[in-house]
């Protein structure tokens, strides 16, 4: 029985052996081999500098490229501005003079309570969300996006700069759902206005979805939105004459608060 001809066999032996003829070349023309050479194996101990910086939680890889070309990064005391430069994990890499440590990527989910601001530090001495996750990791974590002081609910922390950038950019359409409690019932007319889109001081805004919450008073509303504009949910309702009494983020990027009490993290 004849062995079936593989694709490799077909491409290399299409009926008869291919003959190669030597072509003449003159000065300035280099003879090239018809054989393909395998690329040298990459060194597993080397990583791109932009990835190193991103893994240290400073920023995304794209942003790291900008900082590198601007001269913000040094390797073993030498300023590196070359795109694609590679480093070893044992190299001494600094960003604006601060020593970086390429960490394992970590993610912490917090159910934020009220009266904490979303920032890594505050000059005015106000309580920050970092207090709540101080024991969650030894890595330098940063909050992904923000919740204002009086907003509760899901807040993600990570040292993964690329993921943080992706989750905060509106073009990626990251799903965020809020439970809103107003000072009075939301009228059907105003509900329709929100569904169709309204215009605020900083431009038009259209939510992904808004509806009354089942088996609850009409002053309680669920709203899904991917915009990251400052206080956007509160401003939508304030524009229509409502006061937001409670604002709770119940879903963020597919993550939920299930079995996560207020003020706790996992």
Please state what every model-predicted region is.
Residues 1-10:
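N-terminal acidic, proline/glycine-rich, low-complexity intrinsically disordered segments
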Residues 2, 15-18, 31-266:
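Basic, flexible Lys/Arg- and Gly-enriched helix-loop patches that mediate nucleic-acid binding at interfaces
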């Amino acid at each position: 029985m004849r062995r079936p001809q593989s694709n490799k066999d077909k491409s290399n032996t299409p009926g008869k052996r291919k003959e190669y003829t030597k072509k003449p070349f003159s000065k300035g023309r280099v003879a090239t081999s018809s054989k393909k050479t395998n690329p040298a194996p990459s060194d597993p101990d080397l990583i791109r500098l932009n990835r190193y910086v991103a893994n240290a939680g400073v920023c995304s890889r794209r942003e790291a490229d900008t900082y590198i070309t601007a001269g913000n990064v040094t390797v073993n005391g030498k300023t590196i501005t070359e795109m694609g430069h590679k480093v070893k994990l044992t190299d001494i890499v600094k960003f604006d003079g601060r020593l970086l440590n390429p960490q394992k990527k970590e993610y912490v989910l917090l159910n934020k309570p009220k009266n904490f601001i979303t920032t890594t530090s505050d000059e005015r001495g106000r309580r920050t969300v970092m207090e709540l996750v101080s024991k969650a990791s030894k890595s330098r974590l940063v909050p992904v996006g923000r919740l204002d002081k009086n907003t509760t609910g899901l807040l993600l922390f990570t040292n993964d700069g690329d993921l943080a950038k992706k989750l905060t950019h509106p073009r990626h359409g990251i799903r965020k759902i809020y439970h809103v409690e107003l000072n009075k019932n939301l009228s059907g007319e105003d509900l329709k206005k929100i569904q169709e889109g309204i215009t605020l001081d900083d431009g038009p805004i259209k939510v992904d979805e808004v509806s009354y919450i089942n088996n609850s008073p009409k002053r309680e509303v669920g709203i899904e939105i991917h915009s990251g504009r400052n206080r956007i949910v509160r401003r939508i309702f304030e524009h229509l004459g409502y006061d937001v009494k409670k604002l709770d983020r119940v879903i963020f990027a597919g993550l939920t608060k299930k079995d996560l009490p207020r003020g706790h993290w996992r």
